[in-house]
């Protein structure tokens, strides 16, 4: 059960919080992070196992607990926003294999806005927050285009 939870947590991080993935890899802290996090839910998992709770249910409950502090994902939010508002650029990044890299760069460019606006789950549906981010993303993409790193799709 412990290894399954580690694998599922790592998979979640890779897809939803790649900034954390890179940070942990840079510090060689992946194993320690996963170990510490999974240990925090093992007592609950063992209790549910002893109560004959199906493994799939245990995994789902534990993974929800393990990912609570990782939500909402700025990366996922910005990826969706990039697709909605700048679809051609999103497709270009995806085709060139730079989508994750560029979304992480956009996260960096927008980090102050995320902090000052206290990004929460409710921010996902807040049009004001979205409208605050769009000019910053546009500015980033314009700088990228001026540097020659971004080609407009035609």
Regions found by a protein language model. Give the residues of each.
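C-terminal alpha-helical interaction appendages
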Residues: 1-154
């Amino acid at each position: 059960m412990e290894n399954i939870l580690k694998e599922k947590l790592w998979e979640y991080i890779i897809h939803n919080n790649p900034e954390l993935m890179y940070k942990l890899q840079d510090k060689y802290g992946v194993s320690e992070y996963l170990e510490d996090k999974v240990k925090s839910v093992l007592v609950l998992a063992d209790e549910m196992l002893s109560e004959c709770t199906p493994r799939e249910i245990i995994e789902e409950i534990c993974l929800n607990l393990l990912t609570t502090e990782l939500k909402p994902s700025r990366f996922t939010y910005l990826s969706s926003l990039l697709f909605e508002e700048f679809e051609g650029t999103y497709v270009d990044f995806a085709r060139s294999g730079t989508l994750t890299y560029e979304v992480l760069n956009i996260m960096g460019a927008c980090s102050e806005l995320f902090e000052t606006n206290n990004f929460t789950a409710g921010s996902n549906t807040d049009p004001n927050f979205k409208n605050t981010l769009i000019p910053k993303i546009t500015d980033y993409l314009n700088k990228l285009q001026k540097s020659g790193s971004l080609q407009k799709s035609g």
